[in-house]
Each structure stands twice: as C-alpha cells, then as structure tokens.
C-alpha cells in the first residue's frame, strides 16, 4: 500500500551539496511526483526503534512538519540541469521521508562508492584497534619487515605508523601508485616512494596510504571486506558487498568497494 511513482528523471549521486546549494537543506521535504523515478513512502507507524537500515520507520514529510514542495523544486532543478542521480534517501529524526532509485538502478544493485571506500577502511581499522588487533602507533616497517628490507632506508620510513596512514600525513611527496607496475607488489611500491616531509607534518591525499591500512589488516590475518561484513555491515542489514583486490588478494582499501 505504499504509493509509488515511476518516471524518467536524471539526477546526481552527491545530492546533499546540491540541496544545500539550492536552499533545500533548510527544509528537507519530499514529494511524490509522476517523474522518471521510483518513490517509496512508507507508513510503518508502529515499528520499534530500528536495528538495521531496512527496519527504519517510514513517514511522510507533512507528518514531520515539512513541505513537500521544496523537494519537488529540487527534483525539477536536477532535471532541468541534466544532473545524473542514481538514488536518494532522506531521513529526519531517524524516519525515512523519501526514498528513490532512478531507472535503470534499483535497491538490489551493487553500487561502487569510489573513494568513500577509504572511510570504510578507516572504520575497520578503528574496530580492529578497539579489539586490540592492531595499534595506531605500530610502525609500518615492523608490520612489513620483508618488504622494508628492500626499501630505501630513511628516518621518515622508520617513523611511519598506522596513525600517519589514517591521517594521510605519510610525508611522501607523491601518490605511490604512479610507479610502473606498482600493483604487482603494491606494498613494496608504497615503501619505495620518496619522502618530502616527516610523517605527521603535512596532509597529502594518498590512496596508497589507505591501501596500506588494508594490507596491515591482512598481515594480522584479517581480510578487510570479510571483517567489515562481520563487524559492521551485516549487523546494519547491508548484505551485498564486493571489493576489488590486488594480485595478492588484498582489498584495495582506498577505492573499489561496492555495496547495496
């Protein structure tokens, strides 16, 4: 009995910045409109507090004191500017006001989250640290002694820790994976990269640093994807995942994660 509308609108994956830009975030309300998308308004008033995403209570914008016209304006603006949207879900006070998937995308499809993969990797490190399986002050050369033997020795490399990888403050001057054939042995490629600063001094975006977090977990016998699935995703009701792996079977960490 949930009202649905099908349509053919084009939109954006990063909707929230657009909502801010268009002034909609001040009043995030929803509308059911016969456009090029599938809308789902739920009416589960009697659900207890949700334990997973699939159990979140559904409601209507007006029941939360909001005006649907604001979201209608956003959808029309997205269509007018020919901006591609894959899906959108809005919540207020832990209740779903609006949920939509733009054809041909559906809720069942795995979607690649690109560099948001880094956030999931960092969460896995946090969980592992909380369980005592890894320490933030552990030195990288101690985690990878064999590869470190063949890397150019430097004071910076000796200082480098898990914490520096998390902060993207490795001190390396460039992205390590620009090297030819780097993915044949990505750990060694990372350790070979020259330093420009001492670790902890300067932030530089570094996908290789997040890969090394995944590799560090692997050194402890922990597969990143399986660990996240067990500790975080399955308890949240997220059951479908896939992560790109390097030739040695290590999840890429900084990219390549897909989930429902």
Regions of interest found by a model, annotated:
Residues 94, 111-137, 165, 212-217:
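Active-site SXXK
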Residues 53-60:
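Short, contiguous pre-domain boundary segments
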Residues 72-106, 136:
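A short, well-structured edge-of-sheet supersecondary motif
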Residues 40-52:
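Short, Lys/Arg-enriched N-terminal segments with co-localized hydrophobic residues
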Residues 112, 131-170, 192, 219-257:
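Active-site helix/loop module of the DD-peptidase/beta-lactamase fold
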Residues 182-199, 209, 216-217:
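Amphipathic alpha-helical interface segments
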Residues 1-39:
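Intrinsically disordered, charged low-complexity linkers and terminal tails
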Residues 212-216, 255-260:
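Active-site-proximal alpha-helical segments within enzyme catalytic domains
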């Amino acid at each position: 009995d949930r009202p649905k509308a099908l349509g053919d609108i084009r939109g954006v994956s990063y909707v929230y910045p657009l909502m801010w830009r268009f002034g909609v975030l001040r009043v995030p309300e929803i509308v059911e409109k016969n456009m090029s998308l599938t809308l789902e308004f739920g009416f589960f008033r009697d659900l207890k507090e949700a334990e997973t995403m699939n159990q979140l209570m559904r409601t209507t914008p007006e029941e939360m004191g909001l005006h649907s016209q604001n979201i209608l304006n956003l959808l029309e603006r997205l269509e007018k500017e020919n901006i591609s949207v894959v899906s959108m879900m809005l919540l207020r006070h832990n209740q779903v006001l609006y949920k939509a998937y733009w054809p041909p995308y559906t809720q069942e499809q795995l979607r690649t989250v690109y560099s948001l993969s880094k956030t999931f990797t960092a969460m896995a490190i946090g969980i592992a640290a909380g369980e005592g399986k890894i320490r933030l002050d552990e030195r990288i050369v101690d985690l990878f002694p064999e590869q470190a033997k063949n890397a150019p020795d430097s004071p910076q490399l000796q200082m480098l820790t898990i914490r520096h990888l998390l902060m993207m403050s490795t001190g390396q001057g460039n992205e390590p994976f620009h090297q030819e054939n780097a993915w044949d042995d990505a750990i060694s490629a990372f350790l070979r990269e020259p330093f420009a600063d001492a670790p902890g001094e300067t932030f530089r975006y570094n996908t290789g640093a997040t890969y090394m977090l995944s590799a560090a977990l692997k050194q402890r016998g922990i597969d990143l994807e399986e660990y996240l699935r067990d500790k975080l995703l399955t308890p949240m009701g997220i059951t479908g995942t896939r992560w790109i792996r390097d030739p040695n079977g290590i999840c890429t960490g900084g990219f390549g994660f897909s989930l429902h």
